[in-house]
Structures are given as C-alpha cells and as structure tokens.
Amino acid sequence: MLPERHIGAVNWVGLGTLYGKECRRFFKVWLQTIVAPTITSMLFLAVFALAIGRVMPEIGGVSFLQFMAPGLIVMAMMQNSFANTSSSLMISKVQGNVVDVLMPPLSPGELLIGFAMGGMSRGLVVALVLSLVMLPFVHLEVHHFGFLLVHALGASLMLSLMGLLTAIWAEKFDQLAAVTNFIITTLAFLSGTFYSIERLPEPLLTASQFNPFFYLIDGFRYGMIGHADGSLAVGAAVVVGCVVVMWLICLKILIKGYRLKA
C-alpha cells in the first residue's frame, strides 16, 4: 500500500509536472515552435534591410535596423507566448483530455502559474534564439538591463495570459485563429515594431498610445538601444496594470471553471 502523500500550501510536484509538460511540448517540435518564428523574423529583417534599410535616416541616434530589431524580438516573443498557452489548452479541450489537467490536486492558482510559465518560457526562448541569430547582422547591445528584463517578462506573461483566456473562451479553432489574426497580429504590427510612432499623424499617434503592445515594445527597445517614443513611467504602469488585471481575470475564470468544467 502506498504511503499517504501530504500536499502543503503549494503542490510543488504537480506544479512542476504541469510546467515541465508545457515546456516539453514545445521543445519536442522545436522546428515549428522555435526555428520557424526565428526564420520568419529574420525574413522581415532582410526584406526591410534590402528595401529601405540604406535610405532610412537614423532614428534615436541608431540605424533603422538597430531600431527595428528590438521590435521584431518582442513581436516574436509575444506571438509565441500567446500561441503556447492558447494551443495547449485548446487542443486539450477539443480532444477531450482537459480533464487530465483539471482532475489532479492543483488549485486554480497553480494551474494558472503552470500554464503561464510554460508560455513565458517559449516566448523567452524564441527571443533569445532570435537575438543570437541577429547578432552577426545587427549590432545589439544592452542599454538598461532592468528595463529590458522587466518588459521581456511583462510581454511574455501578458501574452501567455491572453492566450490562456482566449483558449478558455474559444470553442473551436476558428475562434482562436480569429483572435490571433485580427487582434494579436494587428496590435503587434501597429505597435511601432517597424517604425517610430512619432512619424504618425494624428489621430493615429494618439490611437497608438492606447495600444498596450506599444508600451511593451517601447520599453524593451529603450532597454536595448536607449530610445523610447513614449513615457517610460506610463509604459511601465500600463504593463503592470494589464498583467495584474489579466491575471485576476484568468484566476477568476479558472476558479469558476467557465467552459472547462461541465
């Protein structure tokens, strides 16, 4: 007879198992989850370098490619953090094995941490690999490590939570694809990834300042090249506020079991 196992305030074994499952899931298909987004981002860099890289003036005292590189890194990080949590939970729901995650003695908070950390890990791994691949072509440096780290963690965590929230809400892959294509991709492309928002006319300039993705990219860019288009204090407040709000929403939904429990 197996001895009785006592679980403390936190089920560390269960939490570690869930996190490990999420990480093994994307490492198992690394060509799709790590190499593919890296190649896509490098293609963006190559196209812009060949098309307008030499004729574009410096932005913030750096070349256009140096300005664009941090934006591409954060965009890849955000998209892959979102994809990891959303696809993992969505596939479990569609295949009917989400019960394997819900039945173990894991609290809603532990489920949230496990899924969110898995998404963050994929986003950060993609960002690291992409940065290393970019090094021979673009001069990358760290201007302010604190801003770089905070906005990298904030971007990956925010999009992990958004992915989890989307997967809970969606009932089929069409709905998940709609959010990915019309919300995540749109906000990422209109957040100053490829341009400085200072070049935008009104009212597009004002509208960009209501895009939370802009502050993620702007803060990360400042941490890397020392240039920011917006207020760093406002950006940090927006990032923290969005993460806290989304965390509380996800936790509340997991507690209620909305669209997860019969």
Regions found by a protein language model. Name each.
Residues 1-262:
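Hydrophobic transmembrane alpha-helices and immediately adjacent juxtamembrane helices
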